[in-house]
């Protein structure tokens, strides 16, 4: 099973999708002449990103995510400048085409904005979890009685009998 990958000035090449996503992206990166350090992804003709660069398991086969005989575009994932506060921010998804369609650029921009908003939202949630003070369970109100633990609700532990307890009782009765 093969797909068409377009790039540059209306150039294209075939790629076999009976391989891992990682291998497919390495192949595409080499074919378009990008260094290994560049983050790339594929998008379909409508501009829908496949988000392979976010995959937890890049060893999964590409044929699970791509349709044979379809055309895909190579897109470069631009992130924030290294060493800055916005280092992991998503700046843009840039199609590696000489004259991309305006609809394609709009679709990629929209997806990039959504992904960035989602990333920022997750960061805020993580920061909020770190800031929330944890109350001691001693001061919490008991659900069954409505009284706090400090007001003297004492619970008796169940009496556990061991084998030694039974043996000593038998000895007492003899």
Swiss-Prot record:
Top-level taxonomy: Eukaryota, Metazoa, Chordata, Craniata, Vertebrata
Any one GO BP annotation for this protein: transcription by RNA polymerase II
Segments for region (Disordered): 138-174
Basic and acidic residues biased stretches: 162-174
Protein name in the entry: Uncharacterized protein CXorf65 homolog
Cited PANTHER family: AB2-183 (PTHR33887:SF4), PB1 DOMAIN-CONTAINING PROTEIN (PTHR33887)
Signal peptide start and end residues: none
Organism: Bos taurus
Any one GO MF annotation of this record: RNA polymerase II cis-regulatory region sequence-specific DNA binding
Superkingdom of origin: Eukaryota
